[in-house]
């Protein structure tokens, strides 16, 4: 063990909370070397050290989740399911990533007998499970959090389309997400489109100048921006910092100093 880390760990037992906070700050600067050491200490019999070790681990987990989401937001065409899980974990930070992924895999398994490899069968399955699109004027964070959407079968138009697109891809059906007059739909290679908002209706494609195509990164950035807006509306400094920080990094902004006070402090 690094001597500096060893000496700092001994100081975690300090009765003075302010001193302990300074020690924690110093330890966090040595993140790459901490994991193994902290695992050994997390069940120590010393309650003060145990509490502070758990605090450090929580901070490290938050940092890593934020870094992972920032990376996904910066990719040219990000992996959509992983990105949505990472975004969910920013808003519901007490949830576990494996639990959210289980909701996704359970959803996939439930579709197997429906053979969702064409628009008709895909639409039938989504109607069967009761998947609906939330009204456009209802801006609720739950509609943009993958785990909640998979539990409630209701979500924002773009997220419902994202879920449908990823499900279809697993069955060999390649769909593109498009926006027509503000509403989202899924476009198939044969020129048909599936419209979740209209009860999973299948329709003919509009002209090329009538729609905008959205890629994975655009969808993830929009969902992150909506959650950031929800955080500002509810004055939630914690989420403003975490989600806002991830978005800022995609614009090469290391901090949120461009925001008005008090969010830039």
Where are these regions (language model features)?
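A structural boundary/capping signal
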Residues: 2-265
């Amino acid at each position: 063990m690094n001597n500096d880390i060893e000496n700092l760990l001994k100081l975690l037992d300090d009765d003075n909370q302010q001193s302990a906070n300074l020690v924690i700050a110093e330890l966090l600067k040595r993140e790459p070397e901490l994991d193994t050491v902290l695992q050994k200490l997390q069940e120590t019999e010393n309650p003060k050290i145990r509490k502070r070790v758990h605090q450090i681990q929580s901070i490290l987990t938050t940092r890593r989740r934020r870094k992972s989401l920032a990376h996904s937001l910066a990719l040219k065409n990000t992996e959509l399911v992983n990105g949505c899980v990472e975004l969910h974990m920013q808003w519901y930070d007490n949830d576990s990533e494996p639990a959210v992924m289980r909701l996704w895999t359970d959803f996939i398994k439930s579709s197997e007998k429906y053979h969702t490899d064409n628009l008709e069968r895909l639409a039938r399955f989504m109607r069967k499970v009761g998947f609906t699109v939330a009204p456009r004027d209802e801006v609720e964070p739950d509609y943009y959090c993958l785990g909640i959407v998979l539990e409630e079968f209701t979500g924002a138009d773009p997220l419902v389309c994202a879920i449908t697109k990823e499900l279809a891809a697993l069955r060999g059906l390649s769909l593109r997400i498009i926006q027509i007059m503000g509403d989202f739909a899924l476009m198939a290679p044969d020129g048909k489109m599936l419209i979740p908002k209209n009860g999973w209706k299948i329709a003919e494609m509009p002209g090329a100048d009538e729609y905008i195509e959205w890629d994975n990164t655009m969808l993830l950035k929009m969902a992150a921006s909506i959650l950031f807006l929800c955080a500002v509306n509810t004055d939630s400094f914690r989420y403003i910092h975490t989600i806002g920080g991830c978005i800022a990094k995609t614009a090469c902004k290391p901090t949120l100093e461009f925001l008005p006070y008090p969010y830039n402090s």
